[in-house]
């Protein structure tokens, strides 16, 4: 929509008291693990559809801004496009679109969990009500979880649901970030690689990390490097890591999933499709 349309949406009086419902939804998700179309830094892109919320900027929804500031008191301090501290708080009060709000929530949630991420942007996807929401991340799974929670929080502020407890959801995100955090040795290596502009990616749920690309790549786990055969032996002994690494290289591997209990095993088998084979993670 044009700038004039946007201005009218912010300023014109409303005949309806509230939006039709919490209609913000994620249509597509992409993870960029290096420089990409949107950013030099790793980023997540959510293609979101606002539905009828396209006609409801933040300043037109009763209680939306106050509720958001109560749940995330640090979010109005974001600089946003105004380039100064508190800029996003001003944008919220003058009226901004809910995809843009979700972007800043995703960043703030990650900062609440201990990550230092600041960059994001929201751009029209070329269709009415659809936007590309791009935001930086430090740990991939935490970044994806933050985006999911951001969308749910926006919908909660539009129309509260009884079964949504934001503090419980935030605590789950923080616990996920703590579980996914590297140990001090691996973190020190990753930080040094980042300071030298050496790309790195996490290869498993633990501390297996690839530094560099192509023929220059090296792998480390904690302080053990791929210069020794011990690391290869450990990887080969872990069926899940081996399967994931082979699949990421484009080699054919059977579908599989790591499970820890009977209920998860039944769910995974149903998703994969019978017949299935069960094997211990490490051993034969």
Task: Locate each region found by the language model.
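Long, compositionally biased, glycine/small-hydrophobic-enriched stretches that function as flexible linkers
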Residues: 6, 12-171, 176-178
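Active-site nucleotide/adenylate-binding loops and adjacent lid/helix of ATP-dependent enzymes
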Residues: 16-17, 30, 62, 218-284
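Short aromatic/hydrophobic-glycine micro-motifs
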Residues: 74-80, 115, 197-199, 251, ...
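Hydrophobic alpha-helical hairpins/lids featuring a short glycine-rich hinge
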Residues: 179-182, 194
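Domain-scale recognition of functional cores that engage charged ligands
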Residues: 183-189, 262-265
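Structured, non-catalytic alpha/beta "coupling" segments that mediate domain-domain communication
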Residues: 189-208
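Extracytoplasmic/secretory soluble proteins
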Residues: 206-212, 230
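Glycine-rich loop at the start of a catalytic domain that most often binds anionic cofactors/ligands
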Residues: 212-218
């Amino acid at each position: 929509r044009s700038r004039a349309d946007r201005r009218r949406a912010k300023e014109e009086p409303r005949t309806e008291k509230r939006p039709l419902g919490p209609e913000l939804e994620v249509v597509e998700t992409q993870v960029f693990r290096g420089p990409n179309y949107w950013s030099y830094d790793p980023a997540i892109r959510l293609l979101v559809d606002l539905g009828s919320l396209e006609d409801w900027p933040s300043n037109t929804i009763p209680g939306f801004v106050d509720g958001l500031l109560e749940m995330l008191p640090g979010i109005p301090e974001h600089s946003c496009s105004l380039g100064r501290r508190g800029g996003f708080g001003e944008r919220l009060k003058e009226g901004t679109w809910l995809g843009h709000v979700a972007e800043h929530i995703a960043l703030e949630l990650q900062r609440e969990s201990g990550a230092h991420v600041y960059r994001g942007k929201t751009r029209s996807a070329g269709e009415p009500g659809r936007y590309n929401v791009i935001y930086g991340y430090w740990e991939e799974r935490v970044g994806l979880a933050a985006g999911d929670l951001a969308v749910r929080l926006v919908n909660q502020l539009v129309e509260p649901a009884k079964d949504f407890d934001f503090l419980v959801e935030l605590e789950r995100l923080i616990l996920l970030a703590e579980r996914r955090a590297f140990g001090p040795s691996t973190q020190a290596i990753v930080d040094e690689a980042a300071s030298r502009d050496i790309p790195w990616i996490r290869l498993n749920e633990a501390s297996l990390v690839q530094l560099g690309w192509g023929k220059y790549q090296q792998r480390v786990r904690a302080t053990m490097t791929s210069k020794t055969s011990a690391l290869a032996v450990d990887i080969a002994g872990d069926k899940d890591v081996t399967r994931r690494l082979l699949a990421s290289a484009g080699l054919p591997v059977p579908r599989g999933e790591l499970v820890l209990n009977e209920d998860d095993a039944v769910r995974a088998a149903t998703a994969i499709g019978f017949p299935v084979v069960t094997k211990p993670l490490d051993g034969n």
